């Protein structure tokens, strides 16, 4: 009987592992597990939408819903019949972003035309969109305008257009289609609404934490009202006496009395009571009787439901689970309509782009391709529309429990052994005093460690095996091999925010697809624009507030100046940032000199961030360091770094954490979020494979616990710390670097299609070069010009922690 039970357990474990590897539902449940550890269990009926639906609008007669899909790939406008819950029309649009408005007769649909700097006006007849007219605000990108939210005054034939690139409001005469006036707003804005008397237009300043009031008669800003952090969507009740403001960076909704111009209540929409960012409140809807408020929490994958019958005394009713990243919500005919920006699941893309094909331009970040068979990650996660019947109290209770089950935040984590060097909670003592955090660029696990037999790798996908990366391999073999680690980001635009803040806000998430689709946009990420910052800053800000000493080498600093205020006087002058003309081994030499200087004075900071970016490579651009040499140089820099630190007198109190900011530039047979990561310390276990599921946020949480820092967001607070990687018994044996197995000075000399293509790439900053195309070039440089790169895989599922072997195995 005992043997039978053991057999059944083994079969069960095996089945769970098999099912866990399939995209979609977790075996035995209706849930989908995402790589970040959060889950989905959407309810209701659904319709397929396009790439990244950012806004849905209900017609005045409540018969139609319009959708604007604003992702990296093909952008479209869709019409949906409310009664039949069917899509009646879909039109492709070159560029679009957020703005969407029916006129009062519902026979015209106004659509913001993105960085073409136009408004398209579609006639609407019998559920169809006809050929649009155009209102031009100015010349197309690179002229900075970029229309966003729209407010239409049919009575006076005026269209108010909020713009996000030149921080303005355009007042347009619909009769002449000319701009009557341009009003400076001062900060990035997203949308505007006006009340029934049309006297005041309320505009949310995404980048200024306030709503400004425009007198429509004067055409001037006359007042402002402070809100919480990063206000985005606005909603007025029918009387116009209360304005609801979603605060994307604060997990909240501000309710403003429009008569007194005061915030009379702030509703917290987070799933659990917390001040930590991470819910990303970004859309609002009221029930027909205006007693119930529905709030979309994009990063909690749910709606928060509140009774607002008595303003000032609003009551939480519960939560409704949605799809992935809900961006818009409307209420119509006892149904709740929710646009899920990333759909219901991630997925593999076995028919990924083939850059050698003449019909494929997805790798160029041009947004769309005529070959519908292609599956490119930038536009892979198609949106969906959830249609949920207004739930009764008992049903809402069930939905609420589902949301709690999907949410790892605030769940009790199992405590490590008392002797584990990683503290269980803030304030506990760790023998580790110095943390070194190395950030690299864009590689997947299989690309680098796919040849390691004891890990879950695919050697066929390994571009940079042990000969090219002997130090990465040695460190993974001698310490811990992490074969179930996933980055939280998709690309570098959000990758450095996730790596340094455990969060990418809604501005970042909603704008990078435009840039990556080659549709214009500033691309001011990586600390270059304040609106991209998390509310409470990055990890250096937390160090500063806690009195933890810190220093940055190249990350959010360019060698001359600090990109963010917290790094002023806290970065290494002369340490290069993103510049492929400079080797990573040169960067390491600069760090060694600076480290030795600080060590001699006993001034080595407790927290150190180091940027080694050259594994990104320059492709096959003639005259540049070849991809193999660039990755080998990066590998040697890591080896020299660990060698120098491990021979120093502070090694016994040190830990090094190494990861990629994202994993976009390569294939992986498990999931393209999977990436190589290393943990090196005297307290790291030796010669072990650790298959616990870890994430970028989990790395950050571990470092925070060592340094005595609080979590920065709901994501690192919910993440699993790296307890399984550490031991209470230190091994102080220093590391000696492995010599490079390839010539580090090899340059690209071949004149072929890949070289010609590489000449068009810009490497001025992260992800300037198209990621898929660059990856194809790198693949060919290693495998040969005629080699075809396997398609990368993207999945919502992750491999659950492998069943641990018994101690006596």
At which residue positions do the language-model features occur?
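Predominantly soluble domains enriched in secretory-pathway, periplasmic, or organellar proteins
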Residues: 5, 10-11, 16, 21-420
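N-terminal pro-sequences and low-complexity stem/linker regions of secreted or lumenal proteins
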Residues: 397-809
């Amino acid at each position: 009987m005992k043997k039978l039970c053991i057999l059944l357990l083994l079969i069960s474990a095996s089945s769970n592992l098999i099912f866990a590897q399939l995209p979609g539902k977790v075996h035995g449940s209706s849930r989908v597990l995402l790589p970040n550890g959060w889950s989905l269990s959407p309810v209701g009926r659904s319709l397929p939408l396009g790439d990244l639906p950012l806004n849905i609008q209900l017609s005045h007669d409540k018969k139609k819903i319009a959708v604007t899909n604003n992702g990296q790939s093909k952008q479209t406008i869709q019409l949906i019949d409310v009664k039949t819950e069917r899509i009646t029309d879909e039109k492709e649009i070159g560029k679009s972003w957020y703005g969407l408005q029916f006129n009062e007769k519902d026979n015209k649909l106004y659509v913001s035309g993105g960085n073409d700097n136009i408004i398209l006006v579609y006639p609407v007849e019998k559920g169809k969109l006809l050929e649009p007219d155009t209102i031009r605000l100015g010349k197309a990108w690179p002229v900075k305008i970029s229309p966003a939210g729209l407010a239409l005054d049919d009575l006076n034939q005026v269209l108010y257009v909020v713009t996000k690139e030149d921080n303005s409001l355009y007042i347009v005469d619909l009769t002449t289609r000319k701009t009557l006036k341009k009003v400076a707003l001062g900060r990035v804005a997203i949308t505007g609404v006006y009340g029934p008397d049309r006297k005041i237009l309320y505009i949310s300043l995404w980048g200024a934490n306030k709503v400004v009031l425009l007198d429509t008669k004067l055409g001037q800003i006359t007042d402002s009202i402070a809100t919480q952090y990063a206000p985005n969507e606005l909603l007025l009740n029918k009387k116009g006496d209360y304005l609801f403001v979603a605060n994307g960076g604060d997990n909240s909704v501000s309710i403003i009395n429009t008569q007194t111009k005061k915030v009379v209540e702030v509703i917290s929409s987070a799933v659990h009571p917390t001040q930590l960012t991470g819910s990303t409140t970004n859309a609002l809807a009221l029930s027909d009787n205006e007693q119930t408020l529905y709030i979309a929490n994009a990063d909690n994958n749910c709606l928060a439901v509140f009774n607002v019958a008595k303003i000032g005394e609003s009551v939480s009713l519960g939560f409704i689970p949605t799809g992935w990243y809900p961006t818009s919500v409307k209420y119509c005919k006892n149904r709740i309509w929710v646009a899920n920006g990333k759909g219901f699941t991630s997925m593999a893309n076995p028919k990924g782009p083939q850059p050698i094909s003449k019909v494929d331009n997805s790798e160029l970040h041009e947004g769309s391709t005529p070959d519908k068979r292609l599956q490119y990650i930038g536009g892979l996660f198609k949106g969906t529309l959830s249609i949920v019947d207004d739930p009764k109290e008992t049903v809402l209770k069930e939905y609420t429990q589902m949301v709690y089950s999907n949410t790892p935040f605030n769940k009790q984590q199992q405590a490590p052994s008392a002797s584990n060097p990683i503290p269980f909670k803030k304030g506990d003592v760790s023998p580790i005093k110095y943390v070194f955090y190395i950030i690299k660029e864009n590689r997947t696990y299989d690309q680098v460690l796919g040849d390691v037999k004891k890990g879950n790798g695919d050697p066929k996908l390994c571009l940079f095996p042990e000969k090219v990366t002997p130090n990465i391999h040695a460190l993974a073999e001698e310490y811990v091999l992490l074969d179930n680690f996933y980055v939280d980001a998709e690309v570098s635009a959000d990758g450095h925010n996730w790596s340094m803040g455990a969060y990418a806000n809604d501005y970042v998430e909603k704008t990078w697809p435009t840039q990556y689709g080659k549709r214009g946009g500033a691309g001011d990420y990586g600390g270059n624009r304040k609106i991209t910052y998390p509310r409470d800053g990055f990890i250096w800000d937390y160090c500063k507030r806690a009195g933890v000493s810190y220093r940055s080498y190249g990350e959010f600093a360019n060698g001359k100046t600090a990109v963010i205020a917290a790094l002023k006087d806290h970065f290494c002058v002369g340490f290069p940032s993103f510049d492929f003309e400079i080797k990573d081994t040169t960067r390491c030499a600069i760090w060694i000199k600076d480290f030795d200087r600080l060590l001699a004075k006993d001034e080595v900071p407790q927290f150190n961030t180091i940027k080694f970016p050259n594994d990104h490579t320059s492709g096959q651009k003639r005259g540049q360091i070849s991809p193999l040499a660039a990755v080998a140089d990066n590998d040697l820099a890591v080896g020299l770094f660990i060698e120098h630190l491990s021979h120093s007198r502070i090694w016994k109190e040190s830990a090094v954490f190494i990861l990629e900011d994202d994993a976009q530039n390569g294939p992986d047979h498990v999931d393209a979020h999977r990436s190589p990561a290393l943990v090196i310390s005297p307290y790291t276990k030796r010669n072990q494979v650790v298959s616990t599921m870890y994430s970028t946020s989990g790395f950050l949480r571990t470092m925070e616990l060592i340094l005595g820092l609080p979590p920065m967001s709901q994501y690192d607070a919910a993440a699993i710390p790296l307890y399984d990687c550490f031991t209470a018994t230190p091994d102080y044996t220093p590391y000696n670097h492995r010599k490079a197995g390839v010539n580090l000075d090899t340059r690209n000399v071949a004149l072929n299609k890949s070289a010609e293509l590489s000449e068009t790439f810009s490497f001025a900053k992260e992800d300037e070069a198209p990621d898929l195309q660059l990856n194809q070039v790198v693949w060919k440089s290693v495998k040969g010009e005629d080699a075809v790169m396997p398609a990368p895989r993207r999945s919502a599922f992750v491999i659950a922690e492998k069943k641990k072997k018994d101690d006596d195995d």
